């Protein structure tokens, strides 16, 4: 600007000059941190593909009956599992535990709670092997039963609210398969998907 407040022609920057100045200015923005993508294993992908999506088309009254029954079965399992944990040779408690998962499997499939049904079938199938003597009880197996029992109330609540499972049932299915094949329980799982999750 001159003394009269008029803009001097030489002071007017052309669009090209503005762009050039911007290009020369240092970039002060913090680069975005990229979250590493965890590649899902083929085993986990296969377990996931075997799971059917939940179906909420069943009559609401029937779904409510299932929710009530599931809560009762989970309460009973909460009593039986500690008894069996103390003495894993105690077959009465083990049969009761197996029956509880069998009930949840059947009723879950019937009302459209397929994620719960398949999770419980994976456990029931494994316990059948324990009962017929073809699969030995291990600390990992006991921990798996306890962990699955801990997860199920969340899945029951998810189904009641008609929302997608907030816990991945495919993890439980794969862990059961690993135990059946006498492999380390978390084979094929990312480190964050162990028994503590």
Predicted regions and their residues:
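Non-catalytic helical tethers at domain boundaries
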Residues: 1-197
């Amino acid at each position: 600007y001159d003394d009269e407040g008029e803009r001097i022609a030489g002071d007017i920057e052309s669009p090209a000059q503005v762009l050039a100045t911007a290009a020369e200015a240092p970039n002060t923005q913090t680069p975005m941190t990229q979250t590493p993508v965890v590649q899902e294993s083929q085993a986990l992908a296969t377990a996931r593909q075997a799971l059917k999506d939940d179906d909420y088309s069943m009559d609401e009254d029937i779904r409510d009956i299932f929710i009530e029954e599931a809560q009762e079965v989970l309460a009973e399992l909460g009593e039986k599992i500690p008894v069996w944990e103390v003495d894993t040779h105690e077959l009465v408690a083990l049969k009761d535990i197996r029956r509880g998962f069998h009930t949840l499997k059947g009723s879950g499939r019937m009302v459209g709670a397929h994620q719960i049904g398949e999770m419980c079938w994976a456990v029931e199938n494994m316990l059948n092997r324990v009962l017929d003597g073809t699969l030995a009880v291990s600390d990992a197996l006991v921990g798996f039963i306890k962990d699955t029992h801990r997860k199920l109330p969340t899945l029951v609540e998810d189904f009641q609210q008609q929302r997608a499972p907030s816990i991945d049932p495919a993890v439980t299915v794969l862990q059961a398969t690993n135990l059946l094949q006498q492999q380390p329980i978390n084979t094929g799982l990312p480190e964050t998907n162990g028994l503590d999750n």
